[in-house]
């Protein structure tokens, strides 16, 4: 009887989506707020565009840097916790074995079922530490490239979002008219972005 291999498809781009949401939402709102405020003060679409693009440049740098630092902090936190787990495995192995047993018992396994698993895991210190990181602390090993990818994704999404409220100011010299279209474009973009 022929068998078809079981293939599971899981969504694995959660971090990238999070970065896009962070960058795009700020990119839509901050330049719009700046353009709306300036429209009340000046009637020159060119001045508003200049200020808007300056804000997009500064905002994308700040947001990208924030994403970079957050991802680096996550990686540093993971590394320090991993070192602590290795230390605990080396210095208090019985306590760590009990913690492993409690984790498996929380899934309904009996003490007799858990004992060989704990024994096998305790012979592999690196796997043991990784297991504790994931199941005791709830930490996943971060991608070493994550900081740069996060920075670029957030900054790019900020720029893309920021262009939307400024686009009407590029299309018309009348700042008041541009503000109306900018508000509509921003609201529609926020609705679509929030819906997706």
Sequence positions of predicted segments:
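Cytosol/matrix-facing amphipathic helices and coiled-coil assembly/linker segments
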Residues: 1-12, 16-18, 72-154
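Hydrophobic alpha-helical transmembrane segments
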Residues: 20, 48-53, 148-155, 179-184
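Residue-level signature of catalytic and energy-coupling elements of molecular machines
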Residues: 26, 65, 114-117, 158
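Alpha-helical transmembrane segments and their lipid-water interface positions
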Residues: 29-33, 62-74, 126-130, 134, ...
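Helix-coil boundary and interhelical linker segments in multi-pass alpha-helical membrane proteins
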Residues: 36-51, 166-178
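Residue-level recognition of pore/gate-forming positions within transmembrane alpha-helices
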Residues: 55, 59, 158, 186-190
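Transmembrane alpha-helical segments of integral membrane proteins
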Residues: 164-165, 180, 184-196
